[in-house]
Curated annotation (Swiss-Prot):
Keywords: 2Fe-2S, Iron, Iron-sulfur, Metal-binding, Mitochondrion, Redox-active center, Transit peptide
Chain residue ranges for the region called Disordered: 37-74
Polar residues bias locations: 64-74
Organelle transit peptide residues: 1-36
Protein name: Monothiol glutaredoxin-S4, mitochondrial
Keyword Cytoplasm: no
A single GO molecular function term of this UniProt record: metal ion binding
Function: May only reduce GSH-thiol disulfides, but not protein disulfides.
Amino acid sequence: MARLMSSALIRGLVRSSCSPTVAAVAQPTIHQFRNYSSGLGGDSTATGDSSSTRVAADPDTHQDFQPTTKSSNMSFDDIVSQDIKENPVLIYMKGYPDAPRCGFSALAVRVLKQYDVPISARDILGDLKLKESVKAHTNWPTFPQIFIKGEFVGGSDIILDMHQKGQLKDVLGDIAQKREQNESS
């Protein structure tokens, strides 16, 4: 039985290493934020009560490789406000644009990518405090939540509806033009 399982495992590994490679295709710019999170409970450093974990007893650990903490005096509400203000197209979503973890988030990204605009995103699954701050900011219960030019637009259903009616092109038009101007400069 063990021999059978190991043979099957080896055959599977050999097959996967022989699979064809996929060519890279140019895609719109996507900014993926690092959450201020250390786990599901949220990040203690975002509220100012940070604690550092260091390996003091290990003389071989170089300072460059010792763990560090991100310290920030910003509240989650401040982070949400700053994200919205600084990013022309922002999605608070489950996962990231390159690896969405929900069908609705994937749909929103797919629609927005058609307009060749820079998309900024933040994964809300990594931090419940961030997720709750976004919900409180918009008074909207579901994700993804999409902001365009500092305005809350809605979720994937609203973006899809705007796309189908031609409204999204008008809203995103000047963002795409600014990107083209920056690339040609």
